[in-house]
Amino acid sequence: MALNSEVMFREQINAMRSQAGRKRATSLQSFCSGNTDDSSADSTDNMDMMVDYPQQKGVSCMRARFNSESTLSKSFRKKVKKLAQKDRRSKERLNGNSEEDAIEVPRGAPSTYAAPSKLRKSKALDCLVSEKPKDEGRSEDSGHGADIEMAKGHFNDVRMKVFAARTAMQVEPALVMKTRKALEMKNAVLENHQSPGAFSLHAAYKIAASAESRVGSITPCNKKVTKEAMANLIRSSYDDTEITQELLFSSKFDSKWKGRYTDIYMRRDENGKKPKRPVNGQGWVMPLKSICEKFGINSTFFTNHRIDLKSARDQVLLMRLLSHDQTSTWISDIHPEAVKNETLAEYLLRELDASTMQKRVQAFKANVLADRDRVRVAGQFYNNIRIGKRMFGAARKAKYLSTIIGGMERRFEILENSVNHIPFTHSASDNNQEKCRNPRVHCRDSTRIALQFPRGQYLGDFIHANRISGKPLFNEFIMTQAPMKNTVDDFWRMVWQEEVPYIVMLTSRKEPERCEYYWPKSPSDPAVTVPGGLRIENFGVYQAPDPLFRVTHLRLIGPDREERHVEHWQGDVNNSSNMYSPLNILRLLRNASKPVVIHDHLGVSRAACLVAAEIAICSLLRGPTYKYPVQRAVQFLRQRRPFSIETPMQYIFVHRLVAFFFRDVIGSAKELDVDYERWLQERSERMFLDDLAAPIPGYRLLSPRADPDIVRMVGRPERPNYRREAPDCVGEMPNKVAAVDGILSPAKSVFEF
């Protein structure tokens, strides 16, 4: 009897398999989607799983019951449906998905995930006894799956970027195409290599932008480095520091160093002594040791201990940044009076009051930490509680934070307000628009440099440059825009006229559209000649301890064979995380007795950050005391160079530079650092159209190519050149207009009212 019942049961299952096109009986599709209106798909798959559902080891299983029409009985269908609903609810609780946590999708926004497709019966049954099924054709690592938490994160990344990209692409569409092509070319090189590290200051970008072509001629960047090519480079690097530095700090060669390369550097010196073999026998140890010996850096931390190349070179770069000897002896030996500031030396010896200075610095830190503002946290609400049932209005209570960076942003908005605008005249720049990079950045007439060289020959007196001098500064700055093709001669006329000892260039040398190459690249290049009998020659390149800057020695020969010498410091100072290099260059310029030239693309962004930081530092050193010295420093700078400090990022960077300069007096401002990292995280969600393969992301740059804070100003009219007075009669009716001629256009004034 038992055998007959078992045979009958198997026949019923086979009959159920062969029946095609029947109506849905068990709602198998609803087990994973929860929808009872879906139609069941035809299936010829194995149905044996139904017999032992749910799986219970050691316990009698729930047996399937069939009607005479070879369909499951109604009671069994109810039990299976209840179990499926219970399983679905438990998974929703684990995933944290509920109706209250539903995403608010903006109108017109694209959908980020699709509903699951129809499944076969066997896969639906497997879902009940194992895990939730995945869509066919989708990988487990897909970011657009049905997981609601991943969809939330995708929404937060996409919603703002779609709008920002649509706006920014209208401004610079060529930049998008250029970035895409550059990324495709670099993809083969950067695919399997890592960035050199935080302190490397984007060494890969620095090497790519370098004028040194000896490495590129041996091993092109788009090809793999062979053993023969690497061996030739190692032999060439023994006598060439430039090649050694490129090999060590380019991530392309990280995996190419072998222990046998150490023997190439184990040569005998002039006295016939052979160097001692280091404990760390990796191939890069001896080349890196040679660089450390050149800059006076102790190399025992990696020669006597086995550490990796990335950690060693990061530490070496940090030591180079911390080096106090950032100057070369070339210009100090020739013109010692040009690098000795008597005003600064006199003040430090006789007038400095250390106690008062310390009180000013402590008050600066206290005011910065106390000047906070309430800032709304994007996308966060108080427990997601709905505070009303109205159809319109706020649906949820927004979350606010009292932040230090918010207070700095509010101070910058106060500076940008037309109430604090400083009117000025700019007739000279209006008459020489062809010599201005941006017609909206005017040059103030009262502080501009009027060219008078050469004597007795008028070649025009305009150059877009302003003099920054006066207390509290100890020296003079000349802030100017990057030279253009038609202003290179004017630039060198200004350098000769003002007897400039230092020129600081804060932009990249590989962007001719942002800065013209106005000096000889190498000693073998022809000299630059300027009308009036001026000649500029390259005397060589000096390897500065600061790895960011490239120093070129220039000799200027005047009309009467008079010689002057200038040091040209070039570095792409655009990384907001690097505090050492800006302070090192300010230490160099502070000791100059003659005016120094500093420029970036427009002369109002990176150069303005360094000069504003120097003004604030000198104000804290010698007084007077201000409650907000950085805000006062920016006002002081804008009185001489209008439009300086363009974005809140640059204004915050000046605060961080000043706090970092006085870190030995006030200690580390941990609250400021934590709040700054939180602000950077929010800033990273905005759209920056920069090189996608760059080691430093766009949101950390001081002046990215498409800054969202500047892109939103596109299309707005130029700022009026007048100071709007604060209303002193609030609450009173406005005065009666005398006539309509002043408020109507000529076209409408002909109508009679």
Swiss-Prot record:
It is found in: Cytoplasm, Cell cortex. Residues 84-94 have a biased composition (Basic and acidic residues). The keyword Cytoplasm applies. Residues 26-46, 77-116 are annotated as: Disordered. Part of a complex, consisting of pseudophosphatases egg-3, egg-4, egg-5 and kinase mbk-2; this complex is required for the oocyte-to-zygote transition. Interacts (via tyrosine-protein phosphatase domain) with kinase mbk-2 (via 'Tyr-619' and 'Tyr-621'); mbk-2 tyrosine phosphorylation enhances the interaction. Inactive phosphatase which acts redundantly with egg-4 in the oocyte-to-zygote transition. Required for polarized cortical actin cytoskeleton rearrangement in the oocyte before and after fertilization. Together with egg-4, required for the cortical localization of kinase mbk-2 in maturing oocyte until the end of meiosis I. Also required for kinase mbk-2, pseudophosphatase egg-3 and chitin synthase chs-1 localization to cytoplasmic foci after fertilization. This is Inactive protein-tyrosine phosphatase egg-5. It comes from Caenorhabditis elegans. The gene is egg-5.
